[in-house]
A protein has these predicted regions:
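Acidic, surface-exposed loops and disordered segments
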Residues: 1-178
């Protein structure tokens, strides 16, 4: 989980971000604005933090025997070594691209959760990353804004809710390869 999620509910902050989102109303009107931020540079400590969390979670299972605990610890250590090696082989741009894709996976899960609760959400890329990073003071935190997800309930007078959604037909979107 080489990303961080900021949750903005403050209207003044949303108003500032609205201007840097090409005046798209969902940014200003949402109840919660989730901003998924990827690290600009991955460091060993980020992986170590996750490994520590994994180890703590696995130690909570007191019913395992000693051998199982040793095997589990070895697997966790191996996972950490592999993760560090995988990130280490990538150049900075490739690592950033990979971390940004992790944000999109998380956004999709939040969208599914929102839909399950009948809360509207709308993923956004249309914003100035540089401006968001400055407004949210992300520069000193080794983070950069990657993708936005405003969530909330639409108003009854939302004129877009009745417009026909335009999507590619299934037969043009999916192609079976044998």
């Amino acid at each position: 989980q080489l990303y961080k999620v900021l949750v903005v509910t403050d209207q003044k902050t949303k108003d500032k971000l609205y201007k840097e989102s090409y005046y798209q109303s969902q940014i200003r009107d949402c109840s919660h604005l989730f901003i998924f931020c990827s690290y600009k540079n991955v460091e060993s400590k980020h992986i170590d933090e996750f490994i520590d969390l994994m180890e703590q979670a696995r130690q909570a299972d007191d019913e395992r025997g000693y051998i199982d605990k040793v095997k589990s610890k070895a697997k966790i250590m191996l996972y950490g070594t592999i993760a560090k090696a995988d990130i280490g082989r990538r150049d900075k741009a490739e690592a950033l691209h990979w971390m940004q894709k992790q944000c999109y996976l998380a956004v999709s899960q939040l969208m599914v959760a929102c839909a399950d609760m009948r809360i509207d959400s709308c993923p956004f890329e249309g914003f100035s990353t540089e401006a968001y990073d400055k407004i949210l003071d992300l520069g000193d935190k080794n983070l950069t804004s990657t993708v936005l997800l405003p969530v909330g309930y639409r108003t009854e007078d939302d004129r877009h809710q009745y417009r026909t959604k335009v999507r590619k037909p299934i037969d043009r979107l999916f192609e079976e390869k044998k």
